Amino acid sequence: MKRRAVLKGAVAGAAALAMPHVARAQGRAKLGFLTWNIADQEALFKEEIAEFQQTHKDVEIEWLDKKGTELPAFYQTQLVAGTAPDIVDLQGAIWVEYAAGGALLDLSPYLAKEPEVAKLYNGDYLSTWRYEGKTYLLPFYISKTLLYYNKTMFKEAGLGAPPTSFDELLAFSAKMAKGEKTGFLTLNFDWLYWPLFKMNGVELLSPDLKKPAFNTPQAAEVLEKLAKATDGGAINKISWTGRWVEPNGAFAGDTVGMFHAHSSAYFFVKGQGRWINPDTLGATQLPGYWATPTNHGFAISKSCKHPELAWEFIKLLTGNKWATEFARRRKLLTGTVEADRAELATIAKEDPLGAAVLQTQLEHTDKFTGNWPLPYDAQLKDVFWPEIQNAVLGRKPAKTALADAERGVERLLRRRA
C-alpha cells in the first residue's frame, strides 16, 4: 500500500533567527523521504519528522513508502528523471549499484567530521555499506542468517545439541527425514544459502572480485552432497524452489527439523506455528558461524539539494532515541548499539525465545559472507543461481553445473571490466 505524508514547517522570521545555521543557510527547503515496504510505521515517521521540524522550521519533508517489489524500479525512474528522493531506505546489496553509478552521496566526509556518530553503530554492520573505501548508508535495521531447530524433532531422532559441521548438519537432517518430515530447509534469495559453501572453504570470487573462484573440487563435493540429501528427503526441496512465504510456511508446519534463515523469519514463523515456544524451538549459529546479512540502511541521493539537512535527518532517524523507539515498536535490531541493548533487555522479559533469536544477530558479526560489494550483484545472481539449482535438484552433474556457471560468470565479469 502506498502512503504519502507531507509535514510542513511554518515560515516565521523570528523563528528562523533561532534556527541552526544549516537550516538558515538553506532557507525554505524540501526533503523527499522514501522507505521500503514499511508503511505500518507511518506514525513513527510522523513523530520523527515533527521532532526534526522543531529545530528546522523551514523544512518540508515528504514521506513516501513503496513495496519491496516496486521501490527499485521507482527509485531508478526518479533518478533518470532527475527527481530522486533525497533520502532513501535501501535493502540488501542493491545500494552498491547506485553507489557505483554515482547516484548516492558518500557519507564518509560527514562521518569523519563527526566521529562520534559512527560510534553509535555496530561497526561490523556499518562496514557492510562500504564500497571502494567509502561509506554510503547508515543502519536502519539489521538481520543476518541463523539456524532455527525443532527441539521436538531433534529429540525424536535421538539428537542433542545442534550440528557443529556441514557433515553433521546433513547427517542430522537424514535422521529426522521420515515420511512427510524433512531435516533441513534454507532460504535462498540474496545469497542467504552461501554460508553452506563458505563453511566448506568455497569462495565465489577471487579476493579482488575480478575472477570466478568457485569451480573447485570442494564446491563440487558440496553440491553433490546437497543434491543427494535433497533427493533423499533430508533437505526439503523448497530450499531450492521457494523464496520467502513457502519456506517459512513449511517450517511453521512442524515438519522440518532445521531452518536456515535470518531473524526476520522468526516472527513470521511464530505467527503461523502454534507449536513454537522456548521448549520446542531453538536458535543458534550455523556451523562455522558464517552468516549472510540482509540489512536496511538510509542513503542520501547525490542529487539532493540540501545534503546537510538530509544528513541531520538520517542522524535523527538512526540516533539512540528514535532507533530505540523503532526497535521497540517493530521488535527488531537496528545496528544502533544502545537501541539494540535496550531492545534485547525489553524483549527478554516479553519473549525470551525472541530475545534468543535476536541475540544471535549481535554475535560473530565478523563472519559475514555473501555480501560482496558488487555493482552487478543482481546480474551475478541471475547467472549463478540457476546452475546451483540445476545441481541440487539433480538436473545436472555438479561439475557440469559449476563449469557452466563459471563460463557465465566469466562473461559477466568481462563485460563489467
Named regions from a protein language model:
Residues 5-25:
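N-terminal export signals
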Residues 27, 50, 54-55, 155-157, ...:
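Extracytoplasmic/periplasmic substrate-recognition and gating elements
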Residues 47, 51-121, 152-164, 249-258, ...:
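Extracytoplasmic "Venus flytrap"/periplasmic binding protein-like
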Residues 92-144, 170, 218, 278-283, ...:
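Hinge/lid segment of periplasmic solute-binding proteins
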Residues 95-103, 108, 112, 123-161, ...:
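Periplasmic solute-binding protein
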Residues 108-121, 202-221, 271-276, 281-291, ...:
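Short, solvent-exposed loop/beta-turn-alpha elements that line the ligand-binding surface or hinge
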Residues 124, 278, 284, 328-383, ...:
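Long, aromatic- and glycine/proline-rich binding clefts that accommodate carbohydrate-like moieties
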Residues 173-175, 211-240:
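Glycine-centered hinge/linker elements that transmit conformational signals in sensory
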